[in-house]
């Protein structure tokens, strides 16, 4: 059956596919496992417009699940951390593919680069021993727990989003407790015919099942259902600053 699914997907894209390149947002681990099962040739890249646009990539045969490949040859990528393999830090890059600054905006340009000319991406990450890059989240969205642990809401959201009937989520900090705002998959609810009582039980089910997969310091205290999809940027990133 896995081969049949694989062949169906390849044929849907014309029958001749080298590899699928994913980017723009973290890939759900369960989806990655499914891709592996059906032997779909895929990889994940990382970059930004200021890097025209690629900073890290690995071909599907070398790609390590959960990573976004290794720095491209034309760029030097570093982690602003005393221990880039174990302590998360900002991802910074320098190279011929990096922009020189923002047009007619010297203040933004000055803020975007370090004194030694590295672009501050605003993303947080780690390297493994083989040089693969792992994105942990955005520096602006990081939450500091009451006991001093760094919590990356994107990682918590990936777990929440893997739960049945969850379409998307945003994790926020309220009085040092994590609250997951969840928009449910309306089509899945209709297809499975859930009644009102079953829908009312979903928030607690989502919380319990998510917390089983999360470390103690990033446990979710509450799940709240929202009525509308989250507002997005033109790049389809959630405008998380709108949600508290």
Q: What does each model-identified segment do?
A:
Residues 1-18, 184-210:
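Alpha-helical "lid/cap" subdomains adjacent to substrate-binding clefts that gate access
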Residues 1-63, 76, 167:
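Gly/Ser/Thr-rich phosphate-binding loop
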Residues 24, 77, 131, 160, ...:
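Residue-level signal for inorganic ion chemistry
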Residues 66-70, 113-116:
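Short Gly/Pro-enriched turn/cap motifs at secondary-structure boundaries
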Residues 78, 85-145, 162:
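Conserved ATP-binding/catalytic segment of the ANL
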Residues 98, 132-161, 188-198, 216-220:
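Adenylate-forming
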Residues 124, 162-187, 211:
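C-terminal boundary motif of the adenylate-forming
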Residues 143, 168, 176, 207-244:
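Conserved C-terminal "lid"/linker of ANL adenylate-forming enzymes
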